[in-house]
């Protein structure tokens, strides 16, 4: 049986941990990986928080060596800020950077982020 591949990342199973705000922190992801998750994803991280060097936001990027492969999820609506955030995540050790375009939470959507960003074609222009 062949397990899924995402880009150049070969997974070792089918179980994936979804990003959950306030839940999928470092400790939770390590436990999920030990329990069989083939890929873990951290809770969504604000691109603006990374841009402004917010310490609490940067703490959300911590990755344990034993949890690879790991995906970090980014949300925002400014392409330049999103690009910077993706670079910060890559430098932090993310195997995959996931762009959140589905969160319906009002506090996210009111800023044009999450599911509100789906209509922004300038954000989708560089999808791969």
Stretch-by-stretch model annotation:
Residues 2-5, 20-95:
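Glycine-rich, positively charged N-terminal anion/phosphate-binding segment
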Residues 12-13, 37:
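Conserved catalytic motifs of the protein kinase core domain
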Residues 17:
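An anion-binding catalytic pocket shared by soluble metabolic enzymes
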Residues 44, 49-50, 101-118:
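Glycine-rich, proline-tolerant flexible connector loops at the mouths of alpha/beta enzymes
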Residues 12, 67-69, 112:
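Short, solvent-exposed beta-strand edge segments and adjacent coil->beta transition regions
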Residues 121-128:
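Conserved small/polar residues in nucleotide/adenosyl-binding loops
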